[in-house]
Amino acid sequence: MIAFCTHDPEYGFELWCLDVEERRAWCIAPKLRLNSVCGDPFVWLSDSKRVVAKFVIEDVELPVKNTVPTGPIVEESSEGEIRANRTYQDLLKDEHDVALFKHYTTSQLELIDVRSRERKKLGTPLSFRKASPSPDGKYLLVDIIQEPYSYLLPASRFGHSVEIWDTETGDVVETVATIPLQEKIPLAFDGVSDGPRSIGWRADVDATLYWAEAQDGGDPNVDASVRDAVFTLPAPFNGLPRRLLSLAWRYAGMIWGDDNTALAYERWYKTRSIRTHLLTPGGDLETALAEGNGPCCGRKADPSQAEALNRLLIDVKNWEDRYNDPGTILTMMNERGKPVIRLVYPEGNKPADGSETVEPSFLVQCPGASDEGDMPYLAVMDTIEAKQQIVWRSKPPLLENALNILESDEETGLPKRLLLKRESPEENPNLFIAELPEDLFENGEPQITQALTAFPHPALELKDVKRKIVTYEREDGVKLNASLFVPAGYDAARDGPLKMFMWAYPREFKSATFAGQMRDSPLRFNRLARTPLYWLTRGYAILDGPLMPVIGEGDTEPNDTYVEQLVSSAKAAVDYVVKEGIAKRCVPRRILSKPVLDPACFLCRV
């Protein structure tokens, strides 16, 4: 079954369910509006029979603003800690904004059987950020926004409490953490709050919490050998947490597999580096009982439990280097609807339950970037040296992407059928089912067995336009590239220069070498969307996405020479198209940080 929302602009969101086999849809909660202001408005339980949904409180009127001032607006600076902070837009401005925020974020949690439509209220109306069920469905991890709010910070930094509720009754089982207003986060990349964060459920077991916590006060400028640690705590949540892993860099996520396999990511923004650790998390172990009734995350770790065995698996020195991108390790949904690592055993030695541990392999998906453009592929990665063996790859003249694995071999876990998206510059992306050859490592050709869609070209007037990825250099030697579009049938030698749009946006880099790498494919469909390509029908040329890298190598910050580099990149693009005879300068002067407008030029007048 599929649960989904319908939206009526005059009413709001309603919750519906679709039985695919019966081909029947029905409204689960008639005359009740979902609250989608914060987080997902509903979530399935693992039994696939019930959902937990957030509903609007219908009998509460919208706060009305008092047009008569109650007094002057006073901003007071009292004694306290001096710290730098970012500036944000669209913040709460007065008491009426506070009342509106509370009104729109407040909702009622309800447990609903999707077939019988039986509903049960859970707890009282609160400002819920999220409600996440445990894999076994017995508990809800509930995140609640707390007052007082702030006039200086966005809602994502408001104080909040995290609790575990009983799914059946809505009773509070344990308080996980009480997190204050996040006004002391260091103003630096990799600066984080000093306390628990990224609280969630371990996906491969019944009900185990995990979270990360800074060990350096959240300040990346402080010298520390351990910056973050990951902790776990199993149900019934009355014990001491286990310190699962210590990290030298900033925690960047976890993917769970089973008791023997999990992945932990750490990153360091200053060097654009990310590392992947392979660890053996183990099962849920009994822990010493906690003394008192403090929040779960406030308890000291159980000293009798050792950290998980782990080793470095992937070390990405600079994530800006697309040509050496190791790819993304694939996950799959387990029987409880939670994402876990997709483990494969190419030798067919998948262990039976209770047998000795066999080292698994992973499936990875990679963009396959190179100077010729992206050529996506799937590969098997061993967990010893992270070496890859390609099992499927996109090949010209089409650009293909594997969207999902539809069927896997029962013995090896290797893919047998794929859901592919195929496209070309002239062909709209469409979906196909592909059967992979029996011996994946012999590079046999996949067989397309079924076309699922046949979307036509959305604008036949633009089907024959020409697109070419062009390369050129900036004054400082940085290699740049862009997508050049010209009208159908255009010949520069015959037709002369055209008027041209350049559609660009700058981006920061730490490496000049990686800044000029190809970040697209010449085989990609010429999408329209919100682009200037429509002007091709009026005889314009388009230089789409010319690289505008702002580079700060070493200790240099990109913004130190932002304007100079931006001007240099624009000048290089203009010089290229003028040299090739595709366009000409409408103003016979050099490019400046302040534009010089030509009153005779249509675009300048606009």
PLM region spans:
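Serine-hydrolase catalytic core recognition
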Residues: 137, 146-149, 204, 255-260, ...
